[in-house]
A protein has these predicted regions:
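Short, solvent-exposed aromatic-acidic interface loops
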Residues: 90-95, 121-127
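Hydrophobic/aromatic beta-strand elements that line small-molecule binding cavities or substrate pockets
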Residues: 7-9, 71-78, 102-110, 122
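Hydrophobic ligand-binding cavity/cleft-lining segments
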Residues: 1-51
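Amphipathic hydrophobic-ligand
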Residues: 1, 98-103
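Beta-strand residues in well-ordered beta-sheet regions across diverse protein folds
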Residues: 19, 88, 119-121
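A short, structured loop/turn motif at beta-sheet edges
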Residues: 12-16, 77-84, 107-117, 162-163
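A conserved amphipathic terminal alpha-helix motif
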Residues: 123-167
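Glycine-rich portal/gate segments that line the openings of hydrophobic small-molecule binding cavities
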Residues: 29, 41-97, 152-167
């Protein structure tokens, strides 16, 4: 089963800033934790991060659902400069309600200079039918709320011209 969530907002910054900030800046400032979601602490094996076909290992703080340490792997699937990212999260190290991968998209559309429409989507893939109702509920409630928090974290980072860590 695939549970889909899409949210959107407007950023008042450059197109480049709106496009690059969520993927190329410090992910620990993007994913700061919320409820059962632990804060991301750092990444390794990220020398080529930001380029299609490459990945990085993501580490998280200890939480109710995570023992702390290596948590998952992020993969860049597609990058269309200043328009679109597609990335995937998988190899979860803790049980994730039957989810086995998350696919995400970050789309930027320039409405006018310094007015950028952001469309942020997730497809949460689960493969344990017993949990499908819970998967759907999780996606439509908790995950959607979490995505809104990420959007706001990225907004503040973009407005503050956060340093890019990757190309």
């Amino acid at each position: 089963m695939i549970s889909r969530v899409t949210i959107s907002t407007i950023y008042n910054c450059t197109l480049e800033r709106a496009f690059k900030t969520p993927i190329l800046c410090d992910v620990s400032k993007v994913h700061t934790g919320f409820g059962i979601m632990p804060k991301v602490t750092h990444c390794t094996e990220d020398e080529n991060w930001g380029k299609p076909g490459f990945s990085k290992k993501v580490y998280a703080a200890k939480s109710l659902t995570q023992k702390g340490g290596f948590a998952s792997v992020d993969h860049v699937i597609e990058r269309v400069e200043n328009k679109y990212w597609k990335f995937q999260v998988n190899e979860f190290q803790a049980w994730m309600l039957g989810f086995h991968k998350f696919e995400a998209e970050w789309e930027t559309t320039e409405i006018e200079p310094n007015k950028i429409l952001i469309r942020y989507s997730y497809a949460l893939h689960s493969n344990q039918p017993l949990f499908y109702p819970l998967n759907w509920l999780f996606a439509k409630t908790f995950w959607k709320t979490y995505m809104k928090r990420v959007l706001e974290n990225v907004r503040q980072m973009a407005y503050n011209n956060e340093l890019y860590l990757y190309d």
